[in-house]
């Protein structure tokens, strides 16, 4: 059984997505297998997009202080708890 997508790192999800794309491009999959692979690939893409969005928010929160040192700035509260 494949690893749950929510538990995957960005790198692992991207690697699996690349394998799926290569398999689909090869044209050797049976139709049902191709559809299942496409569905998982779409979910992996959404997961990767979310991970990139989170990383972008973290990078944007890094600021340079007046004294030239680098610090972080708290992100605006999104109303979501547990993150």
Swiss-Prot record:
UniProt xrefs under Pfam families: Exonuc_VII_S
Keyword annotations: Cytoplasm, Exonuclease, Hydrolase, Nuclease
InterPro entries in the cross-refs: Exonuc_VII_S, Exonuc_VII_ssu_sf
Catalytic activity field: Exonucleolytic cleavage in either 5'- to 3'- or 3'- to 5'-direction to yield nucleoside 5'-phosphates
GO biological process, one term: DNA catabolic process
Cellular location(s): Cytoplasm
Source species, domain of life: Bacteria
Chain segments carrying region Disordered: 63-83
GO cellular component: cytosol; exodeoxyribonuclease VII complex
E.C. number: 3.1.11.6
Subunit structure: Heterooligomer composed of large and small subunits.
Function: Bidirectionally degrades single-stranded DNA into large acid-insoluble oligonucleotides, which are then degraded further into small acid-soluble oligonucleotides.
UniProt-recorded name of the protein: Exodeoxyribonuclease 7 small subunit
Source organism per UniProt: Gluconobacter oxydans (strain 621H)
